[in-house]
Swiss-Prot record:
Transmembrane segments: 5-25, 141-161, 175-195, 216-236
Keywords recorded for this protein, A-Z: Cell junction, Cell membrane, Glycoprotein, Membrane, Tight junction, Transmembrane, Transmembrane helix
UniProt domain comment: The C-terminal region is required for localization to tight junctions which occurs in a TJP1/ZO1-independent manner.
The family this protein is said to belong to: Belongs to the PMP-22/EMP/MP20 family.
Any one GO cellular component localisation term in the record: membrane
Compartments it resides in: Cell junction, Tight junction; Cell membrane
Glycosylation sites: 42, 72
Membrane-topology annotation of the record: Multi-pass membrane protein
Listed name of the protein: Claudin domain-containing protein 1
Organism placement in taxonomy: Eukaryota, Metazoa, Chordata, Craniata, Vertebrata
């Protein structure tokens, strides 16, 4: 194996490993989107009511998004989190202080919630199903797993190529990484589109701002890494095969 191809193969493996770590981290963390709002007063009946609704199994899209807006919420692919006062005194509000302890509480999306239909008017089950938002939501959490699966399968083929001391099978690895990159890019695009459509339905309060978090950024970085790894795998395998064929033809001649 030529040193050029071996170097390209090693670099592609490193890029693939980094992108896999980034993708896995983005799936497992809860900072795809973050809301920033004024810290709420400790101990109020409204706080308790919102928290109870937030953790309820029957919480609809509007209910938990209202809580996310109000309590500096963060959203991942599988969990939603809010920041609430650490010690809640439901019986009477304590005197206001400049600051008080807060704690982050998270609730996981159930598999049923992940596949649940989204409505044209969030929270209103009589408003009809919003098919676009429904399928965007489903794609945004399914595609990252497809991406990881493709990369793992590609890594297995690459391992077989190393055992066989041949670069040619890595063409399949490159193609799988290309498909993984497309899945990651599709997931990111679906998430952005879904957030924009949601905010058109549920406008943010004046005192609340929202931004994409670092988990989302990891997914965004993972996609180009997958594309670069794919290009290197395919180039190394194709060029090495081509040179081997030419050399074989030269020897025969």
């Amino acid at each position: 194996m030529d040193n050029r191809f071996a170097t390209a193969f090693v670099i592609a493996c490193v890029l693939s490993l980094i992108s896999t770590i980034y993708m896995a981290a983005s799936i497992g963390t809860d900072f795809w989107y973050e809301y920033r709002s004024p810290v709420q007063e400790n101990s109020s009946d409204l706080n308790k009511s919102i928290w109870d609704e937030f953790i309820s199994d029957e919480a609809d899209e509007k209910t938990y998004n209202d809580a996310l807006f109000r309590y500096n919420g963060t959203v991942g692919l599988w969990r939603r989190c809010i920041t609430i006062p650490k010690n809640m005194h439901w019986y009477s509000p304590p005197e206001r202080t400049e600051s008080f302890d807060v704690v982050t509480k998270c609730v996981s999306f159930t598999l049923t919630e992940q596949f649940m239909e989204k409505f044209v008017d969030p929270g209103n089950h009589n408003s009809g199903i919003d098919l676009l938002r429904t399928y965007l939501w489903r794609c945004q959490f399914l595609l990252p797993f497809v991406s990881l699966g493709l990369m793992c399968f590609g890594a297995l083929i690459g391992l077989c190529a190393c055992i066989c001391r041949s670069l040619y099978p890595t063409i399949a690895t490159g193609i799988l990484h290309l498909l993984a990159g497309l899945c990651t890019l599709g997931s990111v695009s679906c998430y952005v589109a879904g957030i924009e459509l949601l905010h058109q339905k549920l406008e943010l309060p004046d005192s609340v701002s929202g931004e994409f978090g670092w988990s989302f950024c990891l997914a965004c970085v993972s996609a180009p890494l997958q594309f670069m790894a794919s290009a290197l795998f395919i180039w190394a395998a194709h060029t090495n095969r081509k040179e081997y064929t030419l050399m074989k033809a030269y020897r025969v001649a």
